[in-house]
Amino acid sequence: MATRLSDLFGNSRIIAGLLVNLLSSICIVFINKWIYVHYGFPNMTLTLIHFVMTWLGLFICQKMDIFAPKSLRPSKILLLALSFCGFVVFTNLSLQSNTIGTYQLAKVMTTPVIIAIQTMYYRKTFSTKIKLTLVPITLGVILNSYYDVRFNLMGMIFATLGVLVTSLYQVWVGAKQHELQVNSMQLLYYQAPMSSAFLLVLVPFFEPLTGDGGIFGPWSFLALFMVLLSGVIAFLVNLSIYWIIGNTSPVTYNMFGHFKFCITLLGGYVLFQDPLSLNQGLGILCTLTGILAYTHFKLAEQEEGKSRLTQRP
């Protein structure tokens, strides 16, 4: 009886964690888009608020012994903090300038770029099956972007820069975690305030401080509430991702990611009336097929690697 109650409690915690991640990951996209469309809130300032809220959330977490901070030299994570700024700023600019469908599909291109970076600069090898899955992923993104009736050059530039900087950031995060022997929360705890400091210096040069569109402008209570809510949700996204990776299998995490991808796309078309042509639909289907194939082959290779290790004498 005690075992069954323990299993039930454990499953309930996992379901709750997945639900928090689902709601926060989807809400952050829609709320940010809503803030850009209806209030025109400055992008870099919103990113700065996200960083500050994330650090405050992590500070509370470490006080509650959810994780133990590890002392790190600022010089060791300087480049990582800069790339973190670029990754979030350009990703948000892509969301601001593109439809949610194009924004979501552009993010998928992070996988092919990471593979290219790891192949060229880290001498990492990938199987032919993995490389072939990049064809439908890339083709689908191109199809969707080409037939997007709201296509704009600046949006594509922001999306491209977002993909490049995000890919570099993700590669460097993995390398730094291994080099410094820290987990993602310990790294983010030091990285978030450094990134906040960088943006605090840059914001006055790129965005107005007062008047319409400025951080100290005449914002309504609802606009400020939405911005603060966005910051809280940004923290929940980071926290729930860390929790899911630590408490579920890679299959659960990846399959759940595909579910969120589809829900976010659907929500963009429903909430913001983003137009969807037949060719765009084919592009989305093509990309999703590539993502599923990539996940299947990647997980199969990981399981094969584990079985080889266990079979060694």
UniProtKB/Swiss-Prot annotation:
Q: What GO CC annotations are associated with the protein?
A: Golgi apparatus; membrane
**How is it placed in the membrane, per its record?**
Multi-pass membrane protein
Q: Give UniProt keywords alphabetically.
A: Membrane, Transmembrane, Transmembrane helix
**InterPro entries found in the cross-reference section:** Sugar_P_trans_dom, TPT_transporter
Query: Which terms does the UniProt entry file under GO BP?
Result: transmembrane transport
Q: Does the record carry GTP-binding as a key word?
A: no
The yes or no answer to whether the keyword Signal is present is no
- Which residues are listed as membrane-spanning? 14-34, 40-60, 77-97, 100-122, 130-146, 153-173, 187-207, 215-235, 252-272, 275-295
What GO molecular functions are on record for this protein? antiporter activity; nucleotide-sugar transmembrane transporter activity
Where it sits in the cell: the answer is: Membrane
What superkingdom heads the lineage? Eukaryota
Listed PANTHER family: SOLUTE CARRIER FAMILY 35
What the protein does? Answer: Putative transporter.
**Can you tell me which family this protein belongs to?**
Belongs to the TPT transporter family. SLC35E subfamily.
The molecule here is called Solute carrier family 35 member E3
